[in-house]
Regions:
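M14 metallocarboxypeptidase catalytic domain recognition
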Residues: 18-447
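Bacterial N-terminal signal peptides
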Residues: 5-15
Length: 447
């Protein structure tokens, strides 16, 4: 059973104070107390949102209609033929209809039998405290390789923890080695992405003596950040049940909660495929980088010019996405576009996912990968992990999905680590992967 207290946001009252400290991770991850202060329960407004949320199927035959739906606040999680699906509140359904989009069905999610909870069926998933304990254990087992530090704090004061793997630099010390960053859980309900990041960290540390892995670890500066949105992910599992929460935990002026962190980055912020309605799941926030979580990612990446590759794990749909998301136009630099396509197509052969430019689904502005590429020239990908559909488990696919999803996605991760020195060589590099057994893909049964 989970024993850590789960953090809930206090929405009521004229004054809000969130300035409590969470013990920061030091550069070596040594003996840190990850206890979280106990806070008040959420307001009835947020509880009502949980109860009212529905799984909506609407007609979206083309990119333009899907973009229009996203701008109406609809967080599209699945596309099948000319239909788009996702979780929504009744007011979002009304906004879709007002925009001229046909809504075919709306199923109350609270009645779905697929819902599980961390304390029982999904106890193998890691909450915030358990993830921190796992990272501390990795540091203790390999102190000359692994270190941890906080890239910043969440809205409610939790440390956003990074594990660093580098044989010659610890903590925040600079490094000349080619760097790569893996990030997960921008969206609260995407817990499987946290597990993917944790298992990747564990695999690299535990296999550090193998020649192929040792070669990567000795020549790269690797950062793994398992949870960009710790406040939201902790709320999503509060009360021994899932809440289908997507955003962070900032209280908005209308008593709704949260900003979509993957619409809050600064490149073409809040243009296409994002909403300025605070109650919408795709709410872009009050300004670019208004949220401490996205601001922390910005500061972290800007301070490390050696990072050449970024992979952001999301769920679900089994997709490999690359810029641009905000526009239908492709990347203008021909060599870079060729490298992106080569990397995406090579990784798709490894995990069986579908590779494509992000905007092929629908245009969405203000996301991580667009900003990282535009502002810093970092080759950036989004993986929408398994499963493929809500009907296969959606955001809450159960414990068996952890191992199968990691098995499918280890080789792509190692492939990217290997290319971090020069992604432009991808078209000629083939699909050689260091440190991964040559195994067939085993299929598993939202950006």
């Amino acid at each position: 059973m989970r024993t850590a207290e789960l953090l809930i946001v206090l929405l009521c009252g004229p004054t809000l104070s969130w300035a409590f400290p969470d013990p920061a991770f030091d550069s070596r991850g040594a003996s840190l107390d990850l206890g979280v202060p106990k806070m008040a329960s959420p307001s009835t407004d947020l509880a009502a949102e949980v109860a009212d949320r529905l799984w909506v199927t609407a007609v979206g035959p083309d990119r333009e209609s899907r973009t229009l739906a996203s701008e109406a606040g609809f967080a599209i999680e699945e596309i099948r033929g000319n239909r788009m699906m996702g979780a929504a509140l009744p007011e979002t359904i009304a906004a879709l209809k007002q925009a001229g989009i046909e809504v075919e069905s709306a199923v109350p999610l609270q009645r779905r039998a697929t819902a599980k909870d961390f304390p029982s069926e999904d106890a193998s998933f890691h909450n915030y405290a358990e993830a921190g304990a796992l990272l501390r254990g990795l540091v203790a087992s390999a102190p000359r390789l692994a270190s941890t530090f906080s890239i910043g704090r969440s809205f409610l004061g939790r440390d956003i923890i990074a594990l660093r793997l580098n044989t010659s630099a610890q903590g925040t010390a600079p490094s000349a080695k080619p760097g790569i960053a893996f990030m997960a859980t921008h969206h609260a309900r995407e817990h499987l992405s946290t597990e993917m990041a944790l298992l990747l960290a564990q695999h690299l540390v535990e296999n550090r003596a193998k020649p192929e892995i040792a070669a990567l670890l000795g020549s790269r500066d690797i950062y793994i950040i398992p949870n960009i949105n710790p406040d939201g992910s902790e709320y999503d599992i509060e009360g021994d049940r899932y809440h289908m929460h997507r955003k962070n935990m900032r209280p908005n002026g209308d008593k709704s909660v949260g900003v979509d962190l993957n619409r809050n980055y600064g490149h073409h912020w809040c243009e296409t495929g994002a909403s300025d309605n605070p109650r919408a799941d795709t709410y872009c926030g009050s300004a670019p980088f208004s949220e401490p979580e996205t601001g922390s990612v910005k500061t972290f990446l800007e301070a490390r010019p050696n990072i050449k590759v970024l992979l952001a794990y999301h769920t679900f749909s089994e997709l490999i996405l690359y810029p641009w998301g905000y526009t239908d136009a492709p990347i203008s630099e021909a060599p870079a576009l060729a490298a992106y396509k080569a990397m995406a197509e090579t990784m798709a052969k490894m995990n069986g996912y579908t590779p494509q430019q992000s905007s092929e689904l629908y245009t969405a502005s203000g996301d991580t990968t667009d900003w990282a590429w535009a502002a810093l020239g970092i080759y950036s990908f989004t993986f929408e992990l398994s499963p493929k559909s809500l009907w296969d488990g959606g955001f809450y696919p159960g414990v068996p999905a952890i191992a199968t999803t990691f098995a499918a996605n280890l080789r792509p991760a190692l492939y990217l680590i290997g290319l971090a020195d020069d992604p432009l060589r991808a078209p000629a590099a083939g699909d050689a992967v260091a440190g991964a057994e040559d195994r067939p893909f085993h299929a598993n049964s939202g950006r």
